[in-house]
Amino acid sequence: MELFLTGVVLKPKGLKGELKVKPVTDFPESFLTRREYYIGKTPEDAVLRKVQSARFHQGFAWLVFEGAGSREGAEALVGCGLYVTRDALVAMPDDRAYIHELIGLDVFDETEGRVGKISDVLQMPAHDVYEVDTGDRKVLIPAVEDFITETDLEKGMVRLKRFKEFL
């Protein structure tokens, strides 16, 4: 089963097992409605836990999980990731995509044709950057409209312009 990271447990609060969670999703409001997460240091060791209560405050989710209703139970989860299955992911708007959907897409330049595949997406402060593996080297392309002209998940491709500028 493939799991996707949506948050990271930072620290416990109080004596009743409440956890401060840093969202790593574009949809932090989903923490208020999601009733279960896989929790673990890695996706491979994550176990399913039910949410007992959830609130959102100052950019962080505050969660209590069943079976972790004490400070000691909460402390054991510090540093763990909160994961969800693919079918539990929030649907992206048409003009957006999850990183896992972009990795592996073929990259085409408007004049050069196919130039490689997206091998990674780097999340930078200003905008994402696509790492394109050309076979000979890896090239970093800013994921902005000035360079990316089309992203088609169904066709499995990204079209860009001015690829030679990055070589």
Curated annotation (Swiss-Prot):
Domain PRC barrel: 94-166
Gene Ontology cellular component list: cytoplasm; ribosome
Principal subcellular localization: cytoplasm
MF-aspect GO terms: ribosome binding
UniProt entry keywords in alphabetical sequence: Chaperone, Cytoplasm, Ribosome biogenesis, rRNA processing
InterPro entries in UniProt: PRC_barrel-like_sf, PRC_RimM, RimM, RimM_N, RimM_N_sf, Transl_B-barrel_sf
Biological function: An accessory protein needed during the final step in the assembly of 30S ribosomal subunit, possibly for assembly of the head region. Essential for efficient processing of 16S rRNA. May be needed both before and after RbfA during the maturation of 16S rRNA. It has affinity for free ribosomal 30S subunits but not for 70S ribosomes.
Complexes and interactors: Binds ribosomal protein uS19.
Protein name per Swiss-Prot or TrEMBL: Ribosome maturation factor RimM
Organism: Chlorobaculum tepidum (strain ATCC 49652 / DSM 12025 / NBRC 103806 / TLS) (Chlorobium tepidum)
